[in-house]
Amino acid sequence: MSGVNEIRSAFLNYFGKNGHEIVASSPLVPRNDPTLMFTNAGMVQFKNVFTGVEKRANPRAVSSQKCVRAGGKHNDLDNVGYTARHHTFFEMLGNFSFGDYFKDHAIELAWNLITKEYGLAKDRLLVTVFSEDDEAFGLWKKIAGLPDSKIIRIPTSDNFWQMGDTGPCGPCSEIFFDHGDHIFGGPPGSPEEDGDRFIEIWNLVFMQFDQVAPGSRNPLPKPSIDTGMGLERIAAVLQGKHDNYEIDLFQALIRAIADLTGADPQGEQKASLRVIADHLRASSFLIADGVLPSNEGRGYVLRRIMRRAMRHGQLLGAREPLMWRLVWALVREMGQAYPELVRAENLIEETLRLEETRFRKTLERGLGILDEKSNTLKQGDMFDGETAFTLYDTYGFPLDLTQDALRARGISVDIASFTDAMDRQRALARASWTGSGDTAAETVWFGLREKLGATEFLGYETETAEAEVAALVKDGQVVDQLKTGDSGAIVLNQTPFYAESGGQVGDTGVLSADGVRFRVTETQKKAGDLFVHLGTVEEGTIKLATALALNVDHDRRGAIRANHSATHLLHEALRQVLGDHIAQKGSLVAPDRLRFDFMHPKPISAEELRRVEDIANEVVLENDEVTTRLMAVDDARDAGARALFGEKYGDEVRVVVMGKGSRDRGANALGWSVELCGGTHVKRTGDIGLISVTGESAVASGVRRIEALTGRQARQSANAAIATAKQAAAELRTSVDDMPARIAALMDERKKLERELAEARKKLAMGGGGAAGAANGASDVREVGGVKLMARAVEGVEIKDLKSLVDQGKKQLGSGVIALIATSEDGKGSIVVGVTPDLVARFSAVDLVRKASEVLGGKGGGGKPDMAQAGGPDGAKAQQALDAIAAAIAG
């Protein structure tokens, strides 16, 4: 039982046998919790259970939770690779009791696991308790038989946990392992406690109080247990290692990196190998959980992790993208425990490869500037924070990379001046991370939800019904009536109107009675499941308890049904064409169009789009029945049902099934497309009519969007395209079938004419004293200081042709300097200067072109002594720029 996978399984199975429900790890992106950047502890997914918002059928749970600490308050990034126990990604083993067992059984379960199941020697263990927790002190003596000397009272907050300023809190008890007196360090609470001899392996939190205000606590009616054990730490102990990076999992990754780079795992490059191994885990799991590299929020943290690993790859000599070639090794080690890695393997590889390819030039440029700016510094010096910020802000070179690169030379960064520069920039830029919450204006809906309960939805089976008015709202206030002309909202006791949800727009229609008519223009869901009908009273007065006939707009609902069903078919078709990593990131289902956003790292080719469209339309043509069923959420997932990423589902879910699952398309047994969905759908796939994909684009880094039409809109779009093609064919005097060949011939003819025109312009430009020269007021060849100078402003010449013209001029002169300026349509000037070989020792083309660039309003210029180019925004000063070159030659 020494391997990481065996240790994890043993923990879960032990608590499973002791009545705990084995719960899967929640995603690294916390669900419905804007206060957290990433999941950083096992208790995060149970937060609402501990606070009483949610109830669980089983009051005991156990999990191995994926965690990331690389942003915000919990940030281990800078230390990773240089210490034995810092990680950006780690696994937290934990058992939880929600008002069930408490301290005595928690201590008993923990002690039996580590001493009997894991077999740790009792004399190598000691524990800490909160100084005021006499109960825990006594239980450790009674259950574990520990002497007083091995139960250490800690008076500080290290042994008292609280969720926030208010809420559940309680004392902690930590279990430590003694690595032996050959390692420096003392027990917790001693002056030498920061040494590495005694290492915490498990923290037991006894939630027994409710903090109502600072310093004021009341006992909880049902105390709870929350524990956390770092898998990497306990694995190191059980494998006889004092360093987490020496455990089997990390060693397998480090060997894979060493095999690709030739680095020595025990040599000077050990830290870089460890950084890459750790960051590979964090990057891969974040991508698998839907985070993609970007310039803000979670995506920026991921980008920093990836780029830090890439910089260490360069230190190991990697000159091509490295990390993507290591994903297979991670999947081999952790894919069985975390199948999301297997599903997203292709996406992870492609995202890493693209990001490293994009970053390579930035990395090389940034390191070059860093070397240039720090080459005079010595060990103990401080690197200028303003320059560090310029590297970050202008060149995309993160601060931690600057610090990391300078660390080996013993040089630190002036963080204060970096922070000042960052603060100045933030004052001009929008905040990249904000929380979310309901505004005060929304409180009326929560009050109505509390009073009325959930609205009963009838709309899956019907578009008409009768109902009573349960509440009326106008201008954000509850009212007794709505009169003719009033705009407001109506809440009913039941409704067939679908409320906007899951990307599907809400229904419209009419609510009516004798002498009363209310036009519904929008249906929304408020306070969770309160259906709100927004619109205007067209006739009469509507009061509370008024009985109304409800009629959904049938044609509009039908179009929405078709578009929603089409998104499901397109989702499955995309998965089959592009890979299993395809996951929905958002959608819009409207009556006249649909769009579908999904994770994919690169644009989709025209051929791939055609295949997606064809596959989806095959299912439409087969006219299979669309079925829905209610299932337990775990049963639905086991059957292959696809869920919206990050969505939290109840115990029972609605599953929408389309097509037959028996065809050879890799579909599961339930059907061809199987998704958890609460929307409205067609009865048969043939009711969709036709799916026409109209566009594909990027929404954000790593997120693509396709747009499509169905049914009548698709047919109208196709007819319009055919009419346009016929009109174009008529203009070209050919048939629609022959139009591609006709267009190709015209394009070839145009290119030929453009080439001939360009050649004519170049000849005219170099004609010497001709129309072009006269028109621009340019000089002919003249002698300046004994040197021939050809200085001309040329007209109608592409900037890309200037160099070849300068070469021609050098041949014409034999000996001399050639300067040509071309002005673009937007008024910018571009200049190329050439110097013949016999004069290079006297004149540098780079120096001369920079003189001209200054006049044109540009900065610098570059090239070689015999040929250089530059530019500037003020092309109208072409003659002055040429005069500046002449003056420089004259000396």
From Swiss-Prot:
Q: Which residues bind Zn(2+)?
A: 564, 568, 677, 681
> Where does this protein chiefly localize?
cytoplasm
Q: Which reaction does it catalyse?
A: tRNA(Ala) + L-alanine + ATP = L-alanyl-tRNA(Ala) + AMP + diphosphate
Q: Which SUPFAM superfamilies match?
A: Class II aaRS and biotin synthetases, Putative anticodon-binding domain of alanyl-tRNA synthetase (AlaRS), ThrRS/AlaRS common domain, Translation proteins
Q: What class of enzyme is it?
A: ligase
Localization recorded for this chain is: Cytoplasm
What EC number(s) is this enzyme filed under? 6.1.1.7
- A GO biological process this protein is involved in? negative regulation of DNA-templated transcription
Cofactor dependence is on: Zn(2+)
Cellular component GO terms held in the UniProt record: cytosol
GO terms of molecular function: alanine-tRNA ligase activity; aminoacyl-tRNA deacylase activity; ATP binding; tRNA binding; zinc ion binding
The family classification in the record reads: Belongs to the class-II aminoacyl-tRNA synthetase family.
Q: What is the name attached to this protein's record? A: Alanine--tRNA ligase
